[in-house]
Amino acid sequence: MIELITVVTIVAILAAIATPYFRDFILGQRIRAAGYEIVSALIYARSEAIKRNSGVTVAAATGGWQNGWTVTSGAITLSQHEALQGLTMTGPVAGLVYNGNGRLAATISPFGISAANSSAPQRCINVDLSGLPSSQAGSC
């Protein structure tokens, strides 16, 4: 009986120690997934701009990038993305526009993704003038 109590106590102590780190691990995975989601949307927008030979816009939803974003070509909505629950995302205020050749119409500020009250690593998504996005760990 004493052995069982000892094992249960050790398991409880280990669980208490591991829980905060597990939370940060989960948040880190959510941040990474959100980064890949915006990179995927940017690659899609670029390919649509080339395919249509016309401008394609990626813009934040009302209230900012963490509330989602849309990919449009003129008045046609090509794609809509949901809000990022529990994450903060910053990006170019005016959105970004891909020209028909797949290049950006202007330089933009990078996208930043983080979680409040967490030590999980932030994610930074840069888009070069050729229109290709890249994702890396760390702040922008």
Model-derived regions: residue spans:
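Glycine-centered recognition micro-motifs in short, flexible terminal segments and loops
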Residues: 1-12
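N-terminal helix-rich module
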Residues: 13-51, 55-140
